[in-house]
């Protein structure tokens, strides 16, 4: 009887973790009940529906279209010819490797190992890749905001850009190539499966991302502008001479005579700028994860960690041996230590 059908379907649902003791009977329907129920009523129930048994091909297709009307992204699995209408209607059709030719042609993806676990792994990797792209955008746009504003402010104040063309080439190499490799190589994280599905209308740059990009970018610019002002008034020969009170006094001091920035000061500025972006790459790694920037470093040491070391080594070699080509002079180990520790405060 129908009662036995319901009981059997609930038991199957319980065994696969779909049906729980708290679920009410209205979360299960037969194909006949589904067909006889008008769309208006089904639209109110479809998000709570867990099991539909004895469904015909048109019932499956109708279910897909009702879910899509609720702005859901629908994936359908099937292996038979009767699954073709639903596979065609869904945004993602998944056919089994041993399914019929009709089902495979109607689907977008064929699961060769016939395992539902492959679907969840694919979703996990897709979500992880999407998050990695967002991390790269956060990192890249922050550098763009900082670099562009530094150049613009310099132009308005009638001073030359403190970063030369060759230095900007190195910054762009970090921004486009190394950071892309580092952030794209981050391993997948099973916790992304706990995130709610995105709407099809969601933009890849979210509001938290925009706030982070503008907030951190403007903060970097404010600090770097103050650093330029300080160097123009202080004429230091070692970073140990840096004075925080002098930094704040010189911030808006446009009346005291200024001097041209020395090669040493330009080298300091260039290195501080790059190291700020270096640490910001760690911030981008941790963006929207509620974890430390150094979490799971062991899992990503071969990719992210290696790229981070390459950036540090490249910056050291450029400053130490770059000379006139990069408009730099070598820095002492004390300077390197102070810059490394000071810029890490952005974490």
Give the residues covered by each predicted segment.
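Short, small-residue-biased leader/transition segments that mark boundaries at the very start
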Residues: 2-6
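Membrane-embedded transport module
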Residues: 16-76, 90, 97-291
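Basic, alpha-helical nucleic-acid-binding regions used in initiation and control of genome expression
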Residues: 87
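Transmembrane helix-loop junctions at the membrane interface of multipass transporters and ion channels
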Residues: 152-161, 315-332
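C-terminal membrane-solvent junction of multi-pass transporters and transport-like membrane proteins
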Residues: 205, 209, 288-310
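Hydrophobic alpha-helical transmembrane segments in multi-pass integral membrane proteins
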Residues: 223-227, 309-324
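Small-residue-rich transmembrane alpha-helices that serve as helix-helix interface/gating elements
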Residues: 333-346
């Amino acid at each position: 009887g129908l009662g036995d059908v319901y009981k059997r379907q609930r038991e199957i649902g319980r065994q696969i973790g779909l049906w729980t003791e708290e679920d009410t009977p209205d979360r299960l329907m037969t194909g006949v009940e589904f067909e006889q129920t008008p769309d208006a009523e089904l639209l109110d129930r479809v998000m709570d529906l867990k099991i539909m048994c004895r469904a015909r091909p048109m019932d499956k297709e109708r279910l897909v279209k009702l879910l899509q009307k609720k702005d859901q992204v629908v994936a359908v699995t099937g292996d038979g010819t009767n699954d073709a209408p639903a596979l065609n209607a869904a945004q993602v059709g998944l056919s089994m490797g041993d399914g019929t030719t009709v089902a495979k042609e109607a689907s977008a993806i064929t699961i060769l190992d016939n395992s539902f676990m492959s679907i969840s792994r694919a979703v996990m990797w897709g979500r992880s890749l999407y998050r990695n792209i967002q991390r790269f955008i956060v990192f890249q746009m922050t550098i763009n905001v900082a670099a562009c504003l530094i150049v613009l402010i310099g132009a308005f104040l009638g001073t030359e850009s403190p970063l030369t063309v060759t230095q900007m080439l190195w910054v762009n190499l970090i921004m486009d190539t190394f950071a892309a490799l580092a952030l794209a190589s981050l391993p997948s994280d099973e916790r992304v499966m706990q995130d709610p599905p995105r709407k099809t209308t969601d933009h890849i740059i979210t509001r938290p991302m925009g706030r982070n990009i503008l907030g951190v970018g403007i903060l970097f610019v404010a600090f770097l502008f103050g650093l330029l002002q300080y160097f123009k008034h202080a004429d230091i020969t070692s970073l140990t001479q840096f004075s925080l009170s002098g930094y704040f006094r010189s911030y808006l001091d446009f009346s005291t005579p200024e001097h041209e920035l020395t090669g040493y000061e330009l080298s300091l500025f260039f290195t501080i700028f790059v190291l700020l972006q270096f640490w910001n790459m760690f911030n981008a790694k941790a963006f929207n994860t509620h974890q430390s920037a150094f979490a799971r470093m062991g899992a990503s040491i071969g990719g992210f960690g290696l790229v981070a070391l390459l950036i540090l080594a490249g910056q050291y070699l450029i400053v130490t041996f770059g000379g006139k080509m990069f408009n730099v002079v070598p820095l002492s180990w004390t300077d390197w230590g102070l810059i490394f520790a000071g810029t890490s405060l952005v974490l």
